[in-house]
Amino acid sequence: DRLLPVGSVNPLHEIDVRGEIRRVLDLGIRMIKIHPPHQLFAANAYRGELWQLAEIYRECEERGVPVMFHTGTSVFPRARNVFADPMPIDDVAIDFPRLPIILAHAGRPLYGETAFFLARRHRNVYLEISGIPPRHLLRYVPRVADLASKVLWGTDWPSPGVTSPRKNVEEFRALGLGAEVEKQILWDNASRLFP
């Protein structure tokens, strides 16, 4: 597979969250995206009033379907960046230890250290580096090579500043991280998460 379908279920807008997540996954969706700054809840809100969020995590954990969380600030209208901090995902990783968790944008720009910490702390947490210009990657994730087996490539294309995925790959390779690190980040890690 070269293109994998990704979907989302917003527990604030669904009456039967468990039924909806099952329906979406039964369609062949391979990953669920949760976008806290735009969906307006913390990733661990299931520990309070938004218990339905746990239904999404539980179903994905049972099926081995990764959940990607937007981490890092958003400049788009109506975003609430208080929900952009990845630290609440610490609870998710503990409460759902078999759930593959992907931290989109590696917390950029304000929460990179937190995202890196979570990926190092938890076996089931991975960093995804889309939205970070490759030439600036080492500024945002200076020890990316230390975590190479848990970092996923991404471009966030099409978006401002991303002229093409090919150019992003070329800029990434120009960092000189070494062939093995590049292979893990560009291919191996995603192949393992999405068999």
Q: Which positions does each model-derived feature cover?
A:
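Active-site environment of divalent metal-dependent phosphoester hydrolases
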Residues: 11-15, 39-41, 73-77, 107-114, ...
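Histidine/acidic-residue-rich catalytic or RNA/ligand-binding cores of hydrolases
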Residues: 79-87, 111-120, 137-145, 161-173
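Mid-to-C-terminal alpha-helical segments outside catalytic/metal-binding sites
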Residues: 22-23, 27, 146-150, 163-195
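Hydrophobic faces of well-ordered beta-strands that scaffold small-molecule active sites
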Residues: 4-7, 32-34, 67-69, 101-104, ...
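Glycine-enriched alpha-helix->loop->beta-strand junction motifs that scaffold or abut catalytic
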Residues: 26-31, 62-66, 95-99, 119-126, ...
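Conserved, mostly hydrophobic/aromatic
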Residues: 24, 32, 60, 105, ...
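C-terminal helical cap
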Residues: 109, 130-140, 182-195
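Active-site gating/metal-coordination segments in enzymes
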Residues: 1-75, 121
